[in-house]
């Protein structure tokens, strides 16, 4: 199984590159970060024509994550913890592979630069909440964490 990760820095601006990548390498799963598109503006059809399913947690102009997969994924979760800034930064899904269920976790971590700013404080808050949530996942099943 091939699982790839790509910070695309705008899925719409890179859609031709994404389609080319899918055709050339044929990953089973591609996890994308910084898609910079709301769900309704995401290029679903372009990716579906490449025989992939889309699982999207979009946001206008910034952030956003997506998982595209050849197989149907289950238990899609967005907002796995309450983000006080309501940013689209994590999407999870269950992948059934052979006799196992694997939790896919696609993360786009906040930039905290510079130190001693509100952005840095937010990043620390966000990472603390992420770690709490991941500890629960790590106890239950196999996980693939990418981002």
Indicate residue ranges for each PLM-predicted region.
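Glycine-rich phosphate-binding loop signature in dinucleotide/nucleotide-binding domains
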Residues: 25, 97-99, 137-141
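Active-site-proximal segments of metal-dependent phosphoesterases and phosphodiesterases across multiple
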Residues: 111-123
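Acidic/histidine-rich, metal-coordinating catalytic segments
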Residues: 142-147
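Short, contiguous clusters of charged residues that form electrostatic/catalytic patches at enzyme active sites
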Residues: 13-16, 88, 125-132
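N-terminal, active-site-proximal structural segment of metallo-dependent hydrolase catalytic domains
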Residues: 1-53, 62-65
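A long, amphipathic alpha-helix that forms part
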Residues: 120-141
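Structured beta-strand-rich core segments of catalytic domains in phosphoester-bond hydrolases
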Residues: 35-38, 42-114
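Short, flexible loop segments at the rims of nucleotide/cofactor-binding pockets, characterized by
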Residues: 6-11, 79-82, 121-124
